[in-house]
Amino acid sequence: MIQPQTLLNVADNSGARELMCIRIIGASNRRYAHIGDVIVAVIKEAVPNMPLARSEVVRAVIVRTCKELKRDNGMIIRYDDNAAVVIDQEGNPKGTRVFGAIARELRQLNFTKIVSLAPEVL
């Protein structure tokens, strides 16, 4: 469960290393975001000499959360960290690689480009 002020790792090579959630896209009074939700975040830590710099406001899609994800078949998936992938306005990733495992639910949410770049889909 991601809420405003939550720090997230970045799971791509866009140049950002750490994000802080500042808003959840969707309903105006949503409190938490889960896997597949789009958030507005600020870059707290970035790699030098890359297109994305510190204190930039970006959109990101959440790909991993520490909170369990319950599937319809009874399976429960939990990750070790909270992570997101930086995206543009059309929903395409800004980086060219995605690191770590990605949940299968992103495919149903039309983030197929992120799923195709991921090394492992759970």
From Swiss-Prot:
User: Which SMART domains does the record match to this protein?
Assistant: Ribosomal_L14 (SM01374)
SUPFAM superfamilies, per database record: Ribosomal protein L14
- Which Gene3D superfamilies does the entry link to? Ribosomal protein L14
**GO BP terms in the entry:** translation
* Statement: the UniProt record of this protein carries the keyword Chaperone: no
Which UniProt keywords are present, listed alphabetically? Chloroplast, Plastid, Ribonucleoprotein, Ribosomal protein, RNA-binding, rRNA-binding
Compartments, as annotated in UniProt: Plastid, Chloroplast
Main localisation, per the record? plastid
Q: Matching InterPro entries, A to Z?
A: Ribosomal_uL14, Ribosomal_uL14_bac-type, Ribosomal_uL14_CS, Ribosomal_uL14_sf
Q: What Gene Ontology molecular function terms does this protein carry?
A: large ribosomal subunit rRNA binding; structural constituent of ribosome
* Coiled coil ranges: none
Record carries keyword Plastid: yes
Checking CDD domains in the record gives:
Ribosomal_uL14
Record-linked Pfam families: Ribosomal_L14
Q: What does UniProt give as GO cellular component?
A: chloroplast; cytosolic large ribosomal subunit
Q: What is the protein's quaternary organization?
A: Part of the 50S ribosomal subunit.
Reported function? Binds to 23S rRNA.
The Swiss-Prot or TrEMBL record describes its family as follows: Belongs to the universal ribosomal protein uL14 family.
What is this protein's record name? Answer: Large ribosomal subunit protein uL14c
Name the species this protein comes from. Panax ginseng
